[in-house]
Regions:
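Short beta-strand/turn micro-motifs at beta-sheet edges
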Residues: 1-3, 66-70
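Vicinal oxygen chelate
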Residues: 1-7, 10-19, 37-39, 49-54, 70-136
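Core segments of cupin and vicinal oxygen chelate
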Residues: 8, 16-58
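Short beta->alpha connector loops
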Residues: 42, 65-66, 87, 110-112
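Short, charged/polar, Gly/Pro-enriched secondary-structure boundary elements
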Residues: 55-60, 123-127
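Acetyl-CoA-dependent GNAT
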Residues: 63-68, 131-134
Length: 136
């Protein structure tokens, strides 16, 4: 058997469609402080935006296909979870979203409500800001 690829050094792109690139960009850029890392328009019928933080090991890509409806998140448990162990940093992140009119929603899994707040993006996908650390 071949040795598996060493994915621990890979850069992760989380990509999904959206029906409203402007609204989803505002949510992640203005609400969560992401930067626009790249954009494209009408590339083989697709337009998109990549959002993230320069130097980070991940970024998000949102695409819109001309003539196709992406629809809303398939469940209330489709999550991106950001662990923010520093209480002041967590409070700033929550306040930033709330200051833009985004209200927390009750998490589908009550675990996330114990130390975090859950927000829905414009497509119904959820983002958890968890006031805890993550240790593997």
């Amino acid at each position: 058997m071949d040795k598996p690829a060493n994915l621990d050094k890979a850069h992760l792109r989380v990509a999904r469609p959206s029906d409203d690139l402007l609204a989803v960009t505002r949510f992640y850029r203005d609400g969560l402080g992401f930067e626009i890392l790249g954009e494209f328009e009408d590339h083989d019928g697709f337009s998109g935006v990549m959002l993230g933080h320069k130097g980070s090991a991940y970024h998000l890509e949102f695409t819109r296909q001309r003539g196709h409806e992406a629809g809303r998140a398939p469940t209330e448990d489709n999550l991106l979870v950001f662990y923010l162990p520093d209480a002041a940093e967590w409070n700033r992140a929550v306040a930033r979203l709330e200051g833009l009119g985004h209200k927390p929603v009750k998490a589908f899994n009550p675990y996330w409500d114990k130390k975090g707040k859950t927000f829905e993006d414009p497509d119904g996908y959820r983002v958890v800001l968890q006031n805890a650390s993550w240790a593997v």
